[in-house]
């Protein structure tokens, strides 16, 4: 999700999207699909405590984007099939300091074997 994408489009997306704050990736906002998947109780909680079905590599990707300040994507194999996780840094426009990340998780098609997980 980039800064140029209309917030209404992100909110209306049928795929889970969320804004995570700080190095603990506290969930500050989720679209309807995210809240349907993880519940309103997820707001304010660290992503690692809420999004337990995601593999460790998803959180490593979020950490890397937060640390390096550049967007990255990764294919993940989840129980529902193959998904693409896109993580984009959110930074202060004046200082450039990263204060959070946005995530967008979308299904990619038929299931694949876990050993086929790769970086895009």
Language model region names:
Residues 1-36, 119-120:
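Sensory modules in modular signal-transduction proteins
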Residues 18-20, 60-62, 87-88:
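Aromatic/pi-system hotspot detector in well-structured domains
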Residues 34-45:
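PAS/PAS-like sensory domain cap-loop motif
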Residues 50-77:
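Terminal output helix/cap of sensory domains in signal transduction proteins
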Residues 74, 81-85:
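PAS and PAS-like sensory/regulatory domains
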Residues 85-101, 109:
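Short loop/turn elements at sensory-signaling interfaces that couple input to output
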Residues 104:
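Sensory beta-strand/linker motifs that couple input domains to effectors
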Residues 110-120:
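Sensory-domain boundary/capping and coupling elements
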């Amino acid at each position: 999700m980039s800064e140029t994408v209309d917030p209404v489009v992100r909110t209306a997306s049928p795929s889970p999207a969320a804004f995570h704050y700080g190095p603990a990736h506290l969930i500050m906002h989720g679209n309807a699909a995210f809240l349907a998947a993880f519940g309103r109780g997820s707001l304010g909680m660290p992503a690692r405590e809420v999004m337990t079905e995601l593999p460790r590599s998803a959180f490593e990707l979020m950490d890397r984007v937060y640390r390096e300040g550049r967007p990255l994507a990764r294919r993940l194999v989840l129980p529902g099939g193959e998904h693409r996780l896109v993580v984009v840094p959110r930074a202060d426009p004046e200082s450039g300091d990263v204060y959070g990340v946005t995530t967008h998780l979308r299904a990619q098609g038929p299931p694949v074997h876990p050993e086929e997980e790769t970086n895009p």
